[in-house]
């Protein structure tokens, strides 16, 4: 058993660490509230983009746009959104396990995989995989929002260009979904082809509504130009919304991780204090025994 001085040193060390984790918990809680506000602010825009896309797709259901229709799958693309920093529990690793399962299924089916990674954690993880080709990387930085948006837009454009050129036949996005402060779960959603976001019933209903003239759009300039721009904006809106939601997940996960660390530090301190008291009791007992032995000898 350690001596009393060593135990006191350990207690002080754990207390110092506890102060740091407690402060990080408060900072993460503050940042989480701001991230949730941003996430909620962008949701109406993303939902409106979804509605517009559904209506326009229904009105132009037979228009030969490469973003719309299925084709034989020989290669797929993934946009994986992670964090740039750690200390957020299992948030990133759970996401990577989820998307890696899908990637392995594709590889087993002899389907090639291209990945666009957003966040340094995803970049470091997928760089170690031999069968995965990283074609674009980007990072989101609150201190340089405009630069981050341009970088992310450029990375997304790489994937869109590859889809348009026929180099990939499906495009998916993997990110974390904010369920609550204490629960976040990985999510994989289809971005392209756009028809894949509709069920068979929705496609049938959209065709019927388009035939009956529910949506009758007049396009200025060329319909191809308008639809291409609209579809690109739609994909960008989906990605930006997912990035903001992932940021809220990151801060919530970090807050809970730091709270657990702070609570665990309290348990460790209690155990160390118990050990310290045992050591002191043993020392006192030994001293008393020595005094009694000396008195008996006299």
UniProtKB/Swiss-Prot annotation:
UniProt main location, coarse:
membrane
- Does the keyword Ribosomal protein belong to this entry? no
Report membrane topology.
Peripheral membrane protein
What GO biological process, any one, is recorded here? proton motive force-driven plasma membrane ATP synthesis
Q: Which CDD domains match?
A: F1-ATPase_gamma
The GO molecular function terms of this record are: ATP binding; proton-transporting ATP synthase activity, rotational mechanism
Compartments in which it is found: Cell inner membrane
* Organism domain of life: Bacteria
Gene Ontology cellular component list: plasma membrane; proton-transporting ATP synthase complex
Please provide the record's keywords in A-Z order: ATP synthesis, Cell inner membrane, Cell membrane, CF(1), Hydrogen ion transport, Ion transport, Membrane, Transport
A Pfam family per the record: ATP-synt
Note whether Thylakoid occurs among the keywords: no
Gene3D superfamilies registered for this protein in UniProt: 3.40.1380.10, ATP synthase, gamma subunit, helix hairpin domain
Quaternary structure per UniProt?
Answer: F-type ATPases have 2 components, CF(1) - the catalytic core - and CF(0) - the membrane proton channel. CF(1) has five subunits: alpha(3), beta(3), gamma(1), delta(1), epsilon(1). CF(0) has three main subunits: a, b and c.
Give the family from UniProt. Belongs to the ATPase gamma chain family.
Question: Function, please?
Answer: Produces ATP from ADP in the presence of a proton gradient across the membrane. The gamma chain is believed to be important in regulating ATPase activity and the flow of protons through the CF(0) complex.
The name this protein carries in UniProt is ATP synthase gamma chain
């Amino acid at each position: 058993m350690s001596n009393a001085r060593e135990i006191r040193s350990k207690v002080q060390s754990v207390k110092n660490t506890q102060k740091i984790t407690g402060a990080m918990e408060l900072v993460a809680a503050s940042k989480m509230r701001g991230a949730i506000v941003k996430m909620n602010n962008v949701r109406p825009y993303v939902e409106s983009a979804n509605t517009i896309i559904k209506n326009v797709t229904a009105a132009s259901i037979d228009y030969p746009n490469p973003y719309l229709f299925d084709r034989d799958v020989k290669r797929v693309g993934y946009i994986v959104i992670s964090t740039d920093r750690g200390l957020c529990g299992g948030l990133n690793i759970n996401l990577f396990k989820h998307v890696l399962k899908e990637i392995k299924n594709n590889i087993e089916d002899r389907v090639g995989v291209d990945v666009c990674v957003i966040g340094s954690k995803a970049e470091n993880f997928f760089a170690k995989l031999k069968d995965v080709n990283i074609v674009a990387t980007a990072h989101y930085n609150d201190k340089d929002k405009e630069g981050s948006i341009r970088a992310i837009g450029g990375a997304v454009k790489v994937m869109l260009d590859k889809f348009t050129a026929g180099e990939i036949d499906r495009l998916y996005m993997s990110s974390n979904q904010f369920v609550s402060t204490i629960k976040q779960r990985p999510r994989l959603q289809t971005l392209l082809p756009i028809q894949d976001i509709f069920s068979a019933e929705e496609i049938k209903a959209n065709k019927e509504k388009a035939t009956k003239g529910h949506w009758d759009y007049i396009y200025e300039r060329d319909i191809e130009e308008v639809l291409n721009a609209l579809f690109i904006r739609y994909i960008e809106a989906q990605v930006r919304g997912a990035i903001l939601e992932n940021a809220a997940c990151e801060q919530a996960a970090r807050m809970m991780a730091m709270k657990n660390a702070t609570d665990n530090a309290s348990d460790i301190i209690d155990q160390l204090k118990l050990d310290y008291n045992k050591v002191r009791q043993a020392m006192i007992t030994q001293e008393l025994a020595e005094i009694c032995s000396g008195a008996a000898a006299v």
